[in-house]
Amino acid sequence: MVATSGSSIWMRRLRRALARRPHHLMRAGRALGVVGGVMAAGGAYAIDLPEDRADAMYHFYDGGGTRADGPALLIRKKVADRLSISGSYFIDSVSNASIDVVTTASPYKEKRTEYSLGADYVYRDAQVSLSGTTSDEPDYKANSVSLDVSQEVFGGMTTISLGASRGADHVGSRYEGMFDRAQHWRYRFGVTQILTPRWLMSANLEAISDNGYLGNPYRVAQVFGTLVQERYPRTRSSRALKLRAVGDIGQGEQRAALRAEYRYFWDNWEIKAHTLEVGYTRYFGAEWLGEAFVRYNTQKQALFYSDNAQSETLYVSRNKQLSDFNDVGIGAKATYSAGKIADKFDVKWNAQYQFMRFRYKNFTDIRTHGLYSFDANILELFVSATF
Amino acid sequence: MGSQRRALAVVALGLASLLAGCAAPEPWVKPYERERLADPIMRLSRDALADKHREHIYDVRESARGATGVQGGGCGCN
């Protein structure tokens, strides 16, 4: 379940604060004294709930022999002064003829269905979010629950968030049925800070702990040129730190935003990854919004990864996701505001496209013995309505 | 031992005198100065459903995961 982040809480609050004029604050300050003035500028009011919204999306991915597409829905509605509930539905129809599949097995098709339910409760300057997700495909079933709390402090300039998730999966294969389990714990901490009237930044840290069956029953490893069943550790501990900054660089009435994001990831399988993304968003007239972005990710291989192991080790994998590689992405997004429909629904049409190129440095195509690479196309078409 | 205590006392006095000139920091961007920050283009995540699709694609194909600032987990990724 994707819940609102801490940053959007104070965004809603900003909109509310903007309805109030500076002279109102000054008047309040005079009436209540200096302390009252600070309170009026600070945290004397409650956070607004997330706005009511409905989204319907068609998503598409095609790359490296895998094609996945399907519909997705999301709806969010206030049900009381302080409570908003949300639900989502996501379908992935996967046709898999990836290099792992075509070199060792037969291409296959399967469908993944995911449902989520969530509730957000606000009290003064705090928001509590609880959600549950269930994902079902023929050979993998995953359930998770998440709890997040965020709190505004320092006159609404800082938002602190804390959260945890617990996931429990059943892992199977088409040949054996469900044969093992996996558990996941995630703990996260974040701070969003207003820096200036035009710039804000956030820092997020997340620790993830997994145990159980973490491999893939269909994939094989290669040892001395012979294909063998891959052997994975049954535990993994990961850390990720993400820094983001976004600023309004528009002149005069023009609104244009520049954002930069960097994530450093490391884990006890000795994988280290750096991910960088830069985006630019601006309005074109009153109805159009355009965005362009580039993304770069590079990672170092897991300790037990080998394209063709030359020694027998306890763990061995030829999962290209654990190899040395990098990928670049370039994308664009357009949003058209269609205005109010039936005097109630504020409708927006959206299209987002991204091209990605993956280049592997030590993963070969065993049919050609050349280094493997592939390109991917990603598309999202969706309509959203706020009401 | 005695000289260490004297040094500590001097440092503590020095810090106290430095802090005596300081007031607690106040929020320096007032609510009425946050109009530009409130625009939708300044949100770190504008469209949750599209972002969820994107994150799923990255999670399945890259080792790095987490710290996206949203609740996560629950995907069948094998």
Per-region residue spans from a language model:
Chain A
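Cleavable N-terminal export/targeting peptides
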Residues: 1-50, 387
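Short glycine/proline- and aromatic-enriched beta-strand/turn motifs that initiate or cap beta-hairpins
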Residues: 44-86, 356, 377-378
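Short loop/turn motifs that connect adjacent beta-strands in outer-membrane beta-barrel proteins
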Residues: 45-51, 82, 154-158, 198, ...
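Transmembrane beta-strands of outer-membrane beta-barrel proteins
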Residues: 52-56, 85-87, 128-130, 158-162, ...
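Transmembrane beta-strands of outer-membrane beta-barrel pores
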Residues: 58-62, 91-95, 123-125, 134-138, ...
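Residues that define the transmembrane beta-barrel architecture of outer-membrane proteins
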Residues: 67-71, 111-115, 122, 141-145, ...
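Residues on the lipid-exposed face of transmembrane beta-strands in outer-membrane beta-barrel proteins
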Residues: 73-77, 117-121, 147-151, 189-193, ...
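Outer membrane beta-barrel transmembrane domains
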Residues: 100, 104-105, 208, 214-246, ...
